[in-house]
Amino acid sequence: MTIALGRFTKDEKDLFDTMDDWLRRDRFVFVGWSGLLLFPCAYFALGGWFTGTTFVTSWYTHGLASSYLEGCNFLTAAVSTPANSLAHSLLLLWGPEAQGDFTRWCQLGGLWTFVALHGAFGLIGFMLRQFELARSVQLRPYNAIAFSGPIAVFVSVFLIYPLGQSGWFFAPSFGVAAIFRFILFFQGFHNWTLNPFHMMGVAGVLGAALLCAIHGATVENTLFEDGDGANTFRAFNPTQAEETYSMVTANRFWSQIFGVAFSNKRWLHFFMLFVPVTGLWMSALGVVGLALNLRAYDFVSQEIRAAEDPEFETFYTKNILLNEGIRAWMAAQDQPHENLIFPEEVLPRGNAL
């Protein structure tokens, strides 16, 4: 019996082949299959955000002005979260809440779920775009893997956290000052800065900034012109065709500075990838924990001693008092629908007061 080996060839192109040829064609802006997800979602997310910050009020959901039309500026305008009474409703335009009424849909906070969901899928589409292009030009997919960090943070903060709470109301609104308010909320209600996952996130982001600055400066310092040795000052020519730098010189320099240095470029650049991505993933995990109201460090012994001894106070106990103040002063303003009233005598005061 004879077995013929070979590639199967089609006589004519089907619809998939035709679409594949058009989507993956070499053009100024690559589209690709990922573009079918990325471009519509990014368009709707950005369009919804610009529409909301320009025209839509938050009076019906938060009792706030939040649009340029009402007098806000770029820092104070926002697309606000839906009302707390709407819980985790997707707030579809044709759903039972808005019933196809676009004005009412905007008043209820429908633009927030619209922007959040399209934004999440737009980010996923951008990561798939990096996968697709990397595969097309036969690169490793580390760019896409790195971009999973920002996606994890976005999904955990804007989607998973409010899903663990009573509704979308407790997610961040899409605006600069609104994000600042959310950060204060996280600190007051979750003591977020003392959370080890937040600490790892800060170490990752600031460590990555330090590594980036050191790496950029070192490469600039050790650039040399081909054929003229590694004299970094005399030989540097910004018009040379190809930028090159001396790893040997850089290694010698940092060995003298710190006593240790990266010995090869692969380990160096992997470390620069690992630090920020791991930090972002750890902070995302921490936010998932907060969604479930998990607590981090509680130094109860210090709190008890501070309550018993007016002269004993630590930075931790001071921060706990500050958090109580945030909760007491913020809750009434942040959740007006609850009609919270705190008498003066229950508002926290430090030992010095």
Swiss-Prot record:
CDD domains: Photosystem-II_D2. The modification Phosphothreonine is found at T2. Chlorophyll a ChlzD2 binds at H118. Pheophytin a binds at Q130, N143. PANTHER family: PHOTOSYSTEM II D2 PROTEIN, PHOTOSYSTEM II PROTEIN D1. This is Photosystem II D2 protein. The chain crosses the membrane at residues 41-61, 125-141, 153-166, 208-228, 279-295. Belongs to the reaction center PufL/M/PsbA/D family. It is an enzyme of class 1 (oxidoreductase). Keywords: Acetylation, Chlorophyll, Chloroplast, Chromophore, Electron transport, Iron, Magnesium, Membrane, Metal-binding, Oxidoreductase, Phosphoprotein, Photosynthesis, Photosystem II, Plastid, Thylakoid, Transmembrane, Transmembrane helix, Transport. One of its GO terms (cellular component) is chloroplast thylakoid membrane. PSII is composed of 1 copy each of membrane proteins PsbA, PsbB, PsbC, PsbD, PsbE, PsbF, PsbH, PsbI, PsbJ, PsbK, PsbL, PsbM, PsbT, PsbX, PsbY, PsbZ, Psb30/Ycf12, at least 3 peripheral proteins of the oxygen-evolving complex and a large number of cofactors. It forms dimeric complexes. Fe cation binds at H215, H269. InterPro entries: D1/D2, Photo_II_D1/D2_sf, Photo_RC_L/M, Photo_RC_L/M_CS, PSII_PsbD/D2. 2 of the reaction center chlorophylls (ChlD1 and ChlD2) are entirely coordinated by water. The gene is psbD. Its EC number is 1.10.3.9.
